[in-house]
Structures are given as structure tokens and as C-alpha cells.
Amino acid sequence: MTFNHPVKELIWVVQPRSYTDCKAAKKETRTSITTRLLPYVYDKPAVYEQWIQMNGQDRLERRYGDYFNKVQPYQHHTGFVPGVGVYMYSFAIKPEENQPSGTCNFSRVDTATIVMTMDGSVAVNQDTDDTWNVRVYAINYNVLRIMSGMGGLAYSN
């Protein structure tokens, strides 16, 4: 991940490639296409365990996929329940508030990685779903400083 600025929360989605490239839509009937759009099969998440590394060091120990899907949202959000296959990690105590309550300055992090072990029992069509797409989003801050009539960003590389 190559993010800059202080990040208060990471959100990522794991889906089989065929769920996102519309190839499945050509083969499915109208009633079964809605089930193909979900990022899991057999009501099980595809990720068995995952953890976050920064600059080669573990930021968190290995956690089951449900930790990032159920525990983190429960601890840091009000009334938000992500779907299966949507994961998050909050660096802030209260990420929903505008007032900062914790961040990780990704401007100072050279390498950040989410390491995942996929669940071998979750199988989709082996002919089309041989790879997985992972999309990572970051909610971040930056500060516009104005001094002596000149403006500039507080956090930059």
C-alpha cells in the first residue's frame, strides 16, 4: 500500500476476480447473478487469517478474518456492520468523528502490507476464480497551513 498523510482507518475488500470483471454476468441467470456479486461463497469469508505489517514489522499479530470484519467495526463504529468480505482496521479511537483521535502517519511508512491466508475450504468455480482482487481504501487527514499569506500542506513526502 502506498498511502501518504495521517491515516485514521483502512478498509479493504476481497473478491474473486470473476465477481468484479462482469464475466460471471454473462453466464448467470437473472436470479442467480445477485449471489455472484457477493465476495464469499457458502456463507463463509474467503480470508482465514490476516495481519498488517509496516516496514517489515508486524503491526498486529495474526488474527482470524472475523476480527477485521466483526470486532473492529463493533469497537470503533456505531450502527455499522460490513458485509462478509469487507474488512477494516482503525488507528483512531473514534474514526467517525471529525476531531482526530489517533492516526498512523503513512508519510513515514516505507512499506505497508496486509498479509492474508486464504481459507482453503472456500471454493468457487475453479475455471474462472483462480485469483482474488483486493482493494484497499484509506481515510486520511491533511492540514492546510497558511502562514504569511502562503499556504502549504502539513503532511507530504
PLM segments and residue spans:
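Flexible assembly/topogenesis modules
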Residues: 1-157
